[in-house]
């Protein structure tokens, strides 16, 4: 089949002349498609004597294979050239500044905890932690809270059984510390606490920070001076502060601390008092030798006052529009 060699030569020439993959595909269709030249060659085998058809068919298939190999080689070359051209056009200028990644930010309550820990750390306080699943002794009994006290009721406390509960305060950390350490003691105890309450100013879980000093000759004057300095530092202004007489089972005398707001109204910020002698006795400390003061404050409450947040629940909804304001 002399004309077959010419057909292969023409096909290879057309393949080499193709300048892109689309043009190359047209060559493939022209020569190898359903109506292509080589398909017509295969159809012409019907005119060849039966004994010669196998040999003639083999020759045509070899020719088709040669054209197919030429097509494949040219396609690879064109695709490689196109890739190199695209890569050259997309060359990265490494001297340009990169895209800056957006940094995350601390949660506003975490910021408050860090600020308070830093302040009291400079006064020699250490940070202590304790279990969130507490027993009634450390959460109530050791703190001079009797069995009939309203805080023990189911509507205020999450109980697991008759003796285990989710702690309602971090005061249990103070009890454990006083049992394990001898005075002088200076600690703060931050952590999550739980109470069965949910509204605009209360959530079932919130963060509390309690502080404790036990040493010889500790007086209410020491308590007032420490908390006054703390509040001025935290709110970054010279505040008008007042101590109102109050009642807590674990302190005597007890007080609630208010600061004067910008609207001319008093705002409650924390509770405090001198450690009750019964609490000291419960942990094996002689109240005739040692005295101390304790204070407790809600982290969300202080954060709301510092940043002007009106709904405590916003701290737990993970709304980025809200949280990004504190970055």
From Swiss-Prot:
<dbReference type="Pfam" id="PF01409">
    <property type="entry name" value="tRNA-synt_2d"/>
</dbReference>
<dbReference type="GO" id="GO:0005737">
    <property type="term" value="C:cytoplasm"/>
</dbReference>
<keyword id="KW-0547">Nucleotide-binding</keyword>
<dbReference type="GO" id="GO:0000287">
    <property type="term" value="F:magnesium ion binding"/>
</dbReference>
<dbReference type="InterPro" id="IPR010978">
    <property type="entry name" value="tRNA-bd_arm"/>
</dbReference>
<dbReference type="GO" id="GO:0004826">
    <property type="term" value="F:phenylalanine-tRNA ligase activity"/>
</dbReference>
<dbReference type="InterPro" id="IPR045864">
    <property type="entry name" value="aa-tRNA-synth_II/BPL/LPL"/>
</dbReference>
<dbReference type="InterPro" id="IPR006195">
    <property type="entry name" value="aa-tRNA-synth_II"/>
</dbReference>
<keyword id="KW-0436">Ligase</keyword>
<keyword id="KW-0460">Magnesium</keyword>
<keyword id="KW-0479">Metal-binding</keyword>
<dbReference type="GO" id="GO:0006432">
    <property type="term" value="P:phenylalanyl-tRNA aminoacylation"/>
</dbReference>
<comment type="similarity">
    <text>Belongs to the class-II aminoacyl-tRNA synthetase family. Phe-tRNA synthetase alpha subunit type 1 subfamily.</text>
</comment>
<dbReference type="Pfam" id="PF02912">
    <property type="entry name" value="Phe_tRNA-synt_N"/>
</dbReference>
<dbReference type="InterPro" id="IPR022911">
    <property type="entry name" value="Phe_tRNA_ligase_alpha1_bac"/>
</dbReference>
<feature type="binding site">
    <location>
        <position position="252"/>
    </location>
    <ligand>
        <name>Mg(2+)</name>
    </ligand>
</feature>
<dbReference type="GO" id="GO:0005524">
    <property type="term" value="F:ATP binding"/>
</dbReference>
<dbReference type="GO" id="GO:0000049">
    <property type="term" value="F:tRNA binding"/>
</dbReference>
<protein>
    <recommendedName>
        <fullName>Phenylalanine--tRNA ligase alpha subunit</fullName>
        <ecNumber>6.1.1.20</ecNumber>
    </recommendedName>
</protein>
<comment type="subunit">
    <text>Tetramer of two alpha and two beta subunits.</text>
</comment>
<keyword id="KW-0648">Protein biosynthesis</keyword>
<keyword id="KW-0030">Aminoacyl-tRNA synthetase</keyword>
<keyword id="KW-0067">ATP-binding</keyword>
<dbReference type="InterPro" id="IPR004529">
    <property type="entry name" value="Phe-tRNA-synth_IIc_asu"/>
</dbReference>
<dbReference type="InterPro" id="IPR002319">
    <property type="entry name" value="Phenylalanyl-tRNA_Synthase"/>
</dbReference>
<dbReference type="InterPro" id="IPR004188">
    <property type="entry name" value="Phe-tRNA_ligase_II_N"/>
</dbReference>
<keyword id="KW-0963">Cytoplasm</keyword>
């Amino acid at each position: 089949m002399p004309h077959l060699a010419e057909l292969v030569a023409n096909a290879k020439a057309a393949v080499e002349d193709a300048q892109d993959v689309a043009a190359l595909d047209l060559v493939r269709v022209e020569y190898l498609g359903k109506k292509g030249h080589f398909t017509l060659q295969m159809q012409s085998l019907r005119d060849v004597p039966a004994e010669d058809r196998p040999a003639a068919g083999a020759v045509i298939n070899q020719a088709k294979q040669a054209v197919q190999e030429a097509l494949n080689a040219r396609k690879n070359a064109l695709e490689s050239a196109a890739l190199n051209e695209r890569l050259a056009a997309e060359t990265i200028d490494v001297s340009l500044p990169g895209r800056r990644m957006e940094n995350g930010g601390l949660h506003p309550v975490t910021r408050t905890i860090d600020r308070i820990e830093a302040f009291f750390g400079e006064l020699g306080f250490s940070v202590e932690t304790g279990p969130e699943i507490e027993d009634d002794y450390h959460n109530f009994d050791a703190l001079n809270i009797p069995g009939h006290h309203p805080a023990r009721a189911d509507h205020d406390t999450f109980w697991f059984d008759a003796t285990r509960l989710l702690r309602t305060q971090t005061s249990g950390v103070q009890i454990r510390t006083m049992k394990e350490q001898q005075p002088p003691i200076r600690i703060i105890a931050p952590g999550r606490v739980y109470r069965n309450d949910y509204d605009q100013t209360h959530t079932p879980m919130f963060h509390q920070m309690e502080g404790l000093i036990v040493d010889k000759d500790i007086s209410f004057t020491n308590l007032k001076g420490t908390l006054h300095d703390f509040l001025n530092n935290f709110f970054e202004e010279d505040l008008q502060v007042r101590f109102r007489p109050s009642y807590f089972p674990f302190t005597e005398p007890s007080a609630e601390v208010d600061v004067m707001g910008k609207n001319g109204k008093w705002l409650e910020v924390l509770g405090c008092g001198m450690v009750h002698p019964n609490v000291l006795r419960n942990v094996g400390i002689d109240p005739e030798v040692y005295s101390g003061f304790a204070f407790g404050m809600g982290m969300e409450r202080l954060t709301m006052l510092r940043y002007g947040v009106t709904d405590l629940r916003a701290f737990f909804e993970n709304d980025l529009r809200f949280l990004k304001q504190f970055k």
